[in-house]
């Protein structure tokens, strides 16, 4: 009689050593340049390091990113969008396409963050043409900030809705239809308060919390999938149905293609949070490598785990007619109860999903508060000194005022739900619009420079893939923005209309007005460590190593010049344009006199002496 084994011997021996991060790193070797490439150079900026540089590791960035892009929480709370606009095909294929395209977007954004390891408005400032630096940086920063605030609100509010659904599972009459939104907002306020207090009082545990997040999501997926398959009472759907069935009758759209495009909203709400991670650059030891790799690994892990999570749900999916009978609870709750015919088991499954809420909520407040801090350092926000304040004797080095501001914004947006659910949903849709457009600006600027500006980035896409991945990313961002603006069902009423575009336009107008009222006179461009003249595309940098503060440089003309330079660079290098190397660098001319700050003129030697006190238009 043959001997049967559950797993092949080689799999059993090696499965305990399986590391998903290692698998994703191997995948990155296909699209990324070799890490050992020469001439790696990340831009460093002359800001005082106030936050804890060792607070987060690359693994913690992956965990925080997975929390922001949790397929368990995100796909479950927005399941109605996919079910109405096509069902399994829209959900599964839409998530796969979104996962690949958003991974491309994370790779493209990772190049910029690797070269300019700060929040995205910094990268836009460094990439933009001279006359547009201030404007590009301003719009990128504000769109990213608004996107952070609204995405944080959408995550916590979705969790509050799921909590109410959990309460109503046993008795749907506990809360009346008239008071449903009121109690949802109360739960929302509680969630925001809890995750905010964790950021204020227990920030030193965020590293551990982010790592636990990965394990929670993975085990939640395993438990939910297995329990659904084991305790399913009806007939299983075929694999063909689970992957390719399409029915958009509930949407009212005659066009199947349009319904499919609208279905991307579900995946975009889930996966767009990757662009919030660069705000954490001040709290990572090696941000030029850890942020890009952590960001793309988080997208891959979220997409991969999301597919595994969704397939069993599609296999036990009840008919749509049974899923929208009770509008007080989310469709995912009806899926569990109709499939298992057990309130107790369904209650446990929803609890596993709600566990993600804690990690996602904490991470969203963390990133939004750091976006406030980073943008305020350049005086972009009124009362910027308050938002950048960090208690010098605090153990965790957290910008507490920025955390409180992010909580207040969430509280305010939550009030909109009491006034109008359509208005609140519009702000949630605007979250994706703002994040997409804030990512769009620096990506377009990279193509505008023909990718020369990121040539020496420590993490860089291989040349043969770079243009393709950048262009696909830009097209995807535009498609995502169009998708989010469309109503999920037609015909529309005043209550069901999608007002996301109107809110987005309103945000643009406010940002523009604030620019002319405040930004034009107070906002300052990011301050780099050293002064660099513009480098033409056909020129290469000449790099001189400074052994100490007094060095003799022999110029091309044979002239020896002694320079006394205060070296602020960590690497100890100063870059000199080869075209200018034959000239006396301390002689005033059109190239070395900075005239952007009034009528006062300084030579290059004086500018080095003032490097710690002034900001430069890079």
UniProtKB/Swiss-Prot annotation:
Transmembrane segments: 61-84, 91-110, 132-148, 155-171, 180-200, 212-231, 298-317, 343-367, 403-419, 426-449, 465-486, 499-516
Gene Ontology biological-process entries: gamma-aminobutyric acid transport; polyamine transport
Alphabetical list of InterPro entries matching this protein: AA-permease/SLC12A_dom, Amino_acid_permease_CS
Family under the similarity heading: Belongs to the amino acid-polyamine-organocation (APC) superfamily.
Name of the featured protein: Polyamine transporter TPO5
UniProt modified residues of type Phosphoserine: 569
Subcellular location: Golgi apparatus membrane
Keyword Lyase: no
Topology with respect to the bilayer: Multi-pass membrane protein
Main location: Golgi
Basic and acidic residues: compositionally biased ranges: 598-618
Pfam family, one: AA_permease
Keywords: Golgi apparatus, Membrane, Phosphoprotein, Transmembrane, Transmembrane helix, Transport
Record GO cellular component, one term: endoplasmic reticulum
Lineage: superkingdom: Eukaryota
An annotated Gene Ontology molecular function: gamma-aminobutyric acid transmembrane transporter activity
PANTHER family linked: AMINO-ACID PERMEASE BAT1, POLYAMINE TRANSPORTER TPO5
């Amino acid at each position: 009689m043959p001997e049967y084994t559950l797993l092949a011997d080689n799999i059993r021996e090696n499965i305990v050593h399986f590391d998903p991060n290692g698998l994703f790193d191997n995948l990155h070797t296909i699209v990324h340049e070799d890490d050992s490439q020469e001439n790696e150079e990340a831009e460093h900026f002359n800001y005082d390091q106030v936050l804890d540089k060792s607070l987060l590791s690359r693994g913690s960035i992956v965990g925080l990113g997975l929390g922001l892009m949790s397929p368990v929480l995100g796909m479950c709370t927005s399941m109605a969008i996919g079910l109405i606009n096509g069902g399994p095909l829209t959900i599964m294929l839409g998530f796969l396409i979104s996962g690949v395209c958003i991974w491309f977007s994370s790779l493209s954004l990772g190049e910029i963050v690797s070269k300019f390891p700060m929040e995205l408005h910094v990268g836009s400032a460094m990439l933009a043409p001279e006359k547009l630096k201030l404007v590009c940086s301003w719009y990128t920063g504000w769109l990213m900030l608004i996107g952070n605030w609204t995405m944080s609100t959408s995550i916590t509010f979705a969790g509050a809705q799921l909590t109410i659904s959990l309460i109503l599972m046993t008795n749907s009459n506990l809360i009346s239809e008239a008071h449903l939104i009121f109690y949802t907002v109360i739960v929302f306020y509680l969630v925001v308060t809890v995750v905010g207090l964790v950021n204020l009082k227990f920030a030193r545990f965020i590293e551990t919390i982010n790592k636990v997040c990965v394990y929670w999501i993975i085990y939640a997926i395993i438990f939910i999938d297995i329990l659904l398959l084991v305790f399913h009472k009806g007939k299983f759907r075929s694999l063909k149905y689970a992957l390719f069935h399409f029915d958009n009758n509930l949407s009212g759209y005659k066009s199947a293609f349009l319904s499919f495009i609208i279905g991307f909203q579900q995946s975009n709400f889930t996966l767009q949070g990757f662009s919030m991670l660069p705000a954490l650059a001040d709290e990572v030891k090696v941000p030029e490598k850890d942020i890009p790799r952590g960001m793309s690994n988080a997208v891959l892990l979220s997409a991969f785990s999301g597919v595994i999570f969704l397939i069993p749900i599609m296999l036990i999916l009840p008919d749509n007619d049974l899923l929208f009978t009770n509008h007080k609870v989310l469709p995912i709750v009806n899926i569990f109860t109709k499939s298992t015919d057990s309130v107790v088991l369904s209650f446990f499954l929803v609890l596993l999903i709600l566990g993600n809420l804690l990690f996602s909520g904490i991470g969203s407040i963390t990133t939004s508060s750091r976006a406030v801090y980073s943008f305020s350092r350049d005086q972009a926000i009124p009362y910027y000194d308050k938002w950048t304040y960090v208690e010098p004797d605090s153990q965790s080095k957290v910008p507490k005022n920025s955390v409180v501001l992010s909580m207040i914004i969430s509280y305010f947006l939550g009030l909109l739900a009491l006034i109008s659910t359509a208005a609140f949903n519009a702000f949630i849709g605007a979250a994706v619009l703002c994040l997409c457009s804030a990512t769009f600006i620096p990506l377009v600027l990279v193509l505008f420079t023909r990718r020369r500006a990121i040539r020496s980035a420590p993490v860089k896409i291989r040349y043969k893939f770079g243009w393709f991945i950048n262009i696909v990313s830009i097209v995807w961002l535009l498609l995502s923005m169009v998708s989010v603006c469309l109503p999920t069902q037609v015909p529309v009423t005043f209550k069901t209309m999608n007002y996301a575009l109107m809110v987005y336009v309103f945000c643009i107008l406010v940002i523009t007005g604030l620019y002319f009222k405040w930004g034009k006179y107070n906002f300052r461009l990011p301050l780099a460590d050293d002064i660099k003249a513009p480098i033409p595309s056909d020129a290469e940098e000449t790099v001189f190593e400074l052994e100490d503060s007094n060095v003799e440089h022999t110029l091309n003309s044979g002239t020896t010049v002694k320079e006394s330079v205060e070296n602020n660079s960590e690497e100890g290098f100063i870059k000199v344009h080869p075209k200018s190397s034959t000239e006396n660098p301390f002689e005033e001319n059109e190239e070395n006199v900075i005239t952007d700050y009034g009528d006062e003129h300084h030579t290059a030697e004086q500018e080095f002496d003032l490097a710690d006190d002034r900001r430069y238009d890079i």
